[in-house]
């Protein structure tokens, strides 16, 4: 039996499981812990991310790595959030899911789960990663690119950290993050995502539309998705620029990002 500490501090016992013998001649020993309240991934928010981060923190000294099973709809968002919440990480945290459930005859769940366990159990990759369709991606570089295809995720501006073949897992060690200092692992769970909005610029958008978003009650930040290298329509008499300038003067933080998948 293995012990797992809940966020509340309660210690619970769980069966100790093992994978089949891997290509490396070893088994990965693991235990399964399930949250008391299961959540559809499309409904996750900062509270759910905090619960995951706190669970990793409570059990950090008990395990050599962590595999987190997660629905695919918001999987890339959770990976990105955890990569900033889990600070000074010194162990692998691998998130995965599936496009088809394990009970289906044709599914990707088994390969994704076993592949994640092999990565977390054999390789010291101290990052929050996403494992899917035999590829290991840096968590905060991934995005979902397919609604039903097994190759559901990609990282357009970052090569995979590892690729699994029928023989072994090939790690691109030059890409793996290596800590430059020995700091104690900690978590940051003080998130305020509820007061940040995203707005995608499109041809013909009116400054009044942008202004309406920027005047939402309690808004503190806006991620503005613009054309190309950061371009947006200025509007008649620079109306769009005036709307953005007014919001900045009111203390709203505006971040300009490109809509393009690839950039320098």
Which stretches of residues belong to each language-model region?
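Short acidic, glycine-rich surface-loop motifs adjacent to enzyme active sites
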Residues: 60-75, 217-231
């Amino acid at each position: 039996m293995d012990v797992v500490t809940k966020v509340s501090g309660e210690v619970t016992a769980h069966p100790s499981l093992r994978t089949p013998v891997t290509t490396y001649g070893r088994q990965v020993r693991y235990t399964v812990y399930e949250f008391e309240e299961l959540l559809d991934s499309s409904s996750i928010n900062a509270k759910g991310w905090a619960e995951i981060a706190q669970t990793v923190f409570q059990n950090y000294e008990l395990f050599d790595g962590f595999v987190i099973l997660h629905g695919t709809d918001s999987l890339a968002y959770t990976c990105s959030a955890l990569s900033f919440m889990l600070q000074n990480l010194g162990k692998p945290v691998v998130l995965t899911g599936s496009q088809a459930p394990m009970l289906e005859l044709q599914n990707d769940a088994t390969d994704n789960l076993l592949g994640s366990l092999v990565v977390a159990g054999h390789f010291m990759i101290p990052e929050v990663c996403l494992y899917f369709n035999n590829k290991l991606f840096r968590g905060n570089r991934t995005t979902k690119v397919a609604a039903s295809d097994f190759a559901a995720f990609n990282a357009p501006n970052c090569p995979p950290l590892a690729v699994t073949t029928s023989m072994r897992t090939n790690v691109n060690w030059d890409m793996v993050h290596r800590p430059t200092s020995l700091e104690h692992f900690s978590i940051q769970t003080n998130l305020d995502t509820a007061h940040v909005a995203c707005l995608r610029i499109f041809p013909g958008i009116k400054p009044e539309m942008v202004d309406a978003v920027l005047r939402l009650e309690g808004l503190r930040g806006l991620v503005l998705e613009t054309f190309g290298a950061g371009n947006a329509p200025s509007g008649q008499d620079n109306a769009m620029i005036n709307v953005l300038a007014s919001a900045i003067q009111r203390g709203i933080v505006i971040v300009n990002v490109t809509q393009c998948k690839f950039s320098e």
